[in-house]
């Protein structure tokens, strides 16, 4: 056969060589020819016209496919038969055909009409698959490549045929009708397609060539370790062949091969390495089966499948079974390998709810799985108590085993969701789904058995091996720099203070120097000399109770007196008796759990002799738990002066830093993030380098990488000991931008939507999530930036940069979170998709979202983060991307957080897994199809500036979305109030409802009846009438926060508020009087915060507050109210802590009874009458001097506003007369700078003018 091909096709190879040369040697590119718009004006046009014409004449003269015989041209180049040459030729041909297809201008001489484009697209696919085949044979072959010359030759001829068609397609002007007619070109392309099943020569066909080469490979399949991308490509070849002739009869085989192909691309090579040989066998067997069938059918046109199977002796079910096994294995592995390794324990809750919904909504599609799904549901429900234990007992002695089992359970939950969805959408065959669910049931059963076995194991883990302890930095003789004020405070507590025993506890994040500071005090002679016994022990995360006791006894009575053979209880008694009559100083370092203190505290007797215990811990809760008299000390981070002082001391010792290095040194110290440990690490690097500016500059440039790598072990240790239910919450901080304050309510809503929060009967998910957050704060992993004034709850937080970087890096390692930055180098088309399954993707550019969307079908979250501060608060339009259509690729999307920054063209109502949406919209209505999002829990839609002020119509179908927990839309109104009243369900889960717009009290009552469990409500009302008697509007009993804004300012409120558990009330724009406030107060016995803004106080502008009104009120704020006379009874506001008065210009004075409110801590007066200021100062004098209220604070502010409306870029300029500071609220145009300065100089306060000039100078405007 080889000789036949050599003799018969040598002439064709000669033409192939010519066509390849035209493409490759002369660098002819179809696209480049098209883009050369000025051909006619240059000599190049004549040259190329001649080249094209001569080549076409040569092709047609020598080979007319195959009308004319070929002349014998002797071409026997060994390189022509090499796979490398063949692949290079195919690459060139594919590139040119692609260029040809991109030309869409009908006036171009290269334009390809539509019917011919379809044929060329088919040919392109054939060429790509042919290249895969050549690559596969070349990679898998262990014999010399010349053994497959026939195959490579045939591949080259097929590719070259297309090259000739491309050249023949090119027209030549001025030659009349001598060009190849379009119909002939079309036939030539059809000839090529027919070569797939037609015999080229009696006894020789394309299929027979493929059979020969596959049989050769089958006999010697090696242990090949090739990239699996090639594997997925080679699967496409036999799969694609099934589209001709027998596809209807071989549908099952075709389906399996398609599944194999589609899933291989998602499977990392490491997960295939133990199956590559089996994979090769399956691919070769599939090819042999298909090509053998087609080889016989090509010779016998009327042959049916049964005849072919009989002739070949095939048992089709038996031949297909290995393929089926491999398909299932690859599908399962492709899904499992990309699951995140960190999970939220609330995912099982979400799955169980969805399984019930699925079986109701898709009963027909899931009918054949009914029994299996019920078994799975029962097994998951039986696991719920175990998952509860994992959350509630994070320090269980079998913590590792528990968390491993919990992780396996969550992974099975992911699989069930995926398989059920695939069944509903018919994306996976029934045989595969049934096998997969049976395996899941078996695996869940094994997990349950492991848990049950664990529960029967005797607990013998009182002592834990300490081999995994984090290597500690040297503590003794370590000179401390900084914290001088802290040291002095602690020294006084150790030597003075209460007569009884006291615990001096320090807590703070890793690396702050707690241990160093404690050892400094412990070794201070002035301290130690005052105690009879000094002893210390280091606890760490893993410890032995007995070893701690032995360490303390060795210090207390000496090494020789310690009896190590005693039991722990006996040693504890010995220690207690040793300390009992003495004044002792004990250092207990690095305590991780309250239970440690429970174990040790009984050994430390209190006999009122000023004994002291120093305790260090990372966790606030531990420090607070151990405290007796002194409050726990939260060790602060270094300031810039201390940071530089420590760095200088560590690098230069007793010497001083060179003036040349001081600036760069201070910059490096600042870059260390004020963390002493980080500063010490960098100092070690600098100490080993030449003291040259260039060297230090290099350190500064690389500081981020080095400091984080070196300090990672400390942070990693804190992360390692986190309970598994907190790990996902902590890593999720990696989705936020650096140095940005994080809003807590938003963070908690995201945590819940991501299934990080495990439900607990009797508690809301929000309350549980707040507990998770406080735990992370107590471990010093999260920094609080703002707490609520009334209840002390955290309102905002942030992460230190070191911790944030750790979260991002670790989250990527765990396949949990991937950042796709606008300068991302790795594109989805050029990488292995290791993050496309159930991960969270954070984007910084909308274009990245478009590029990645096609490869992210199983992503669970899409988070958009805008780095550019210029766009802060400015929504970005996504119309150019049609984002709603792009998002359809994310079929498992549960969280879509566009951070109020992206305008979406429409809500993606097809994504029924969605639980959280936050975005901007331009429309004034929402489609009724939004109810398709039946899993949605949080809907936050902001309006663009064009839509601001307009009422948005909310369809009545929203009230069918019974899982909604948070609905935030500015100024919305129900579209059909009658339908809302008659047909809609109650939203029992809805907790926050922001900005509905009511025009009647009846409308408000109706909506409140539909939302019985609201906790927070912000709404706008339009009160049209002033009734003779107030109507009592009953708000939900659980309501805690209410903000009411009146759209028609200073209209009377037409209802009385009744909310027995309301803690926060804000009224704005109303006309009120004492009667209304008195009646309201009777219904608000638990109110803690009252804010009245822009309120008109009746005709007399008077407010009488009697005894018993607002008994729990802590904060009272009045702003721009018309209040003139304020009469307050002596015993009113008994628990008031803060009083804020802003622009209350008519108020005569603050009532004198505020002098006697012992709980009062703060009064703020801004832009009020001088008499009000005077009364506030009198209250301060009485509170501080007479009541000894040392915590009382008075703040007086006077602000003058200069509105420079004629100046571009200026909104307002405010001068604070008390603090002498000036603020420009917007940037100023450079052209207007001088005008701004001149106008400011007219202000009487020259120092304020100087301040703004300095600001402008820093901005580069002066």
UniProtKB/Swiss-Prot annotation:
GO terms for molecular function: ADP binding; ATP binding; metal ion binding. InterPro entries: Apaf_helical, Disease_R_plants, HMA_dom, LRR_dom_sf, NB-ARC, P-loop_NTPase, R1A-like_N, RX-like_CC. Keywords: ATP-binding, Coiled coil, Cytoplasm, Hypersensitive response, Leucine-rich repeat, Membrane, Nucleotide-binding, Plant defense, Repeat. It is a peripheral membrane protein. ATP binds at residues 508-515. Residues 475-761 form the NB-ARC domain. Its main location: cytoplasm. Residues 364-384, 475-496 form a coiled coil. It comes from the Eukaryota. GO terms for cellular component: cytoplasm; membrane. It is found in: Cytoplasm; Membrane. Residues 1181-1248 form the HMA domain. GO terms for biological process: plant-type hypersensitive response. Confers resistance to late blight (Phytophthora infestans) races carrying the avirulence gene Avr1. Resistance proteins guard the plant against pathogens that contain an appropriate avirulence protein via an indirect interaction with this avirulence protein. That triggers a defense system including the hypersensitive response, which restricts the pathogen growth. Belongs to the disease resistance NB-LRR family. This is Putative late blight resistance protein homolog R1B-23. The lineage of its organism: Eukaryota, Viridiplantae, Streptophyta, Embryophyta, Tracheophyta.
